[in-house]
Curated annotation (Swiss-Prot):
Gene3D superfamilies: FAD/NAD(P)-binding domain, GidA associated domain, C-terminal subdomain, tRNA uridine 5-carboxymethylaminomethyl modification enzyme MnmG/GidA. This is tRNA uridine 5-carboxymethylaminomethyl modification enzyme MnmG. The keyword Cytoplasm applies. Residues 215-227 have a biased composition (Basic and acidic residues). The gene is mnmG. Homodimer. Heterotetramer of two MnmE and two MnmG subunits.
Amino acid sequence: MQTYDAGTFDVIVVGAGHAGVEAGLASGRMGAKTLMLTINLDMVAFMPCNPSVGGPAKGVVVREIDALGGEMGRNTDKTYIQMRMLNTGKGPAVRALRAQADKWDYQHEMKHTIEKEENITLRQGLVDHLVIEDGVCKGVITNSGAIYYAKTVVITTGTFSRGEIIVGELRYSSGPNNQQPSVKLSEHLEELGFELRRFKTGTPPRVKSSTIDYSKTEEQPGDDHPRAFSFDTVDMMLDQLPCWLTYTNETTHEIIQANLHRSPMFTATKKGTGARYCPSIEDKIVRFSDKPRHQIFLEPEGKNTEEVYVQGLSTSLPEEVQREMLRTIPGLENVEMMRVGYAIEYDAVMPDQLWPSLETKLVEGLFTAGQINGTSGYEEAAGQGLMAGINAARKVFDKEPIILGRDQAYIGVLIDDLVTKGTEEPYRLLTSRAEYRLLLRHDNADLRLTEIGHEIGLISDERYERFLAKQSAIEAEKERLQKTRIKPTAEVQAMLKEIGSGELKDGILAADLLRRPEITYDKIAQIVSRETFITDEIAEQVEIQVKYEGYIQKSNLQVEKMKRMEDKKIPENIDYDAISGLATEALEKLKKIEPLSIAQASRISGVNPADISILLVYIEQGKIAKISK
């Protein structure tokens, strides 16, 4: 193939899925001349699986992306067909927003957003090779021979990386949704010395809405007063579409059991490791054989399509078996299957080959983000893409990378887990993975991250001024409640009695009364009137910060303790072989991961407290080993 010089850029982003679009937008908006290359321009920000955004932990990630200046939250607010706040009956640490998106509107709106950015060039092209000079990535080469040069490159190829679709006995090379896969780039990464592993994910069949008997299902409406993902969104759409709940049954399970020998999950044809937290229906009936039924949610894929996503029925059984089992489910007895469910296997770069900036250790100037790093989910991909784009642009401008701490963001937890622990299966973000989840809430993402977003140039001055005003209003109202004393008047006592709260014996500070579990900020506002208007967002923040003050303080003390460990940096030139006393496994892991701090070293699987003590003594005594020649 004859090659030709096709142009020079600051940053090149390979792929335009959920990681790629955030990487490209971040880089371009920070002032870097950015090229985005994608196999198919019609697939920008496409949702090949569930047409939804958010959920536990993931919804908080979308808020964090928005607080830093990313696009996923704004785009979802423009294109949702249903919005629900989950876990409203639980504490604020686990509340999360989830949207059903119009998958077609979502991708078209995102593509239009990218096309409007003056620093971004969006082109169709299949990247086969990287341009590497002296261990530094200098650009990419496409299958048409075009050579694009750049100072940094971000790979976000997702499940296209040597993708293979599997349906029963049928197996063929393909990206998601029967798109062209990226084969040669995977081969090239292996040639460069990267360790790749085969992972697997799956998707359920899509069925025709007009052939569903919804009277046999349970309606799942959106919230009456939907909330936004983006801190910029003002007006919310009230015209929402419902989802519908139904269940599998013993007949469904019998059909699946009878055909397990034809499922790639249980035959030698499956090579990739699947996602633990997104099991196929075959996997569910085997692992949970005692359950007589499993939930199935029928989710519309958009306003202008008949296609309905059958959530909970991810499968790679043969096509005729899928049709048969669908028709055993209440409401789907006469359903028409429009698209068959399938499994897809793909290559993932083992993420312990990355620095916390998402730059690869093997090749300078090369970043990876999204499912290629071993994660599952649009939100996890978008969060990584944003950080990779930010750090790729900052490297161009000779600035230090932005690395979010585990106490700052779920995105920080995600990336730290990946680069420190690696992953043996597709990684899904869960609230249980965050040790400081009371600090990493849906409601306070802007308070945690807007400062950083503004500092790096992704949050406008106008939005930053609004943020500062909100911050001031929260503090002013908290201070007012700390100073305002409520007297035990007849009116107050009657209100307390009505809601089952103990009567007052003496006067009480408004803040102390608010700490009672049954007392809301609205109740306090009825007793203690205020002169200035307080938005619902500010009221919510005041209530949470006052009510959970003790728990938040405890978490902050834990963070301070952890930060002292983060501040103990491990010198770049350390020779672990020169440290006597380290366990063999710890020595191997420390040499492979190359942690930046004692705190990161302590989180590596196989490195125990005794190893950390030895490492600390070695560093503190100044015994920094010789630099390898």
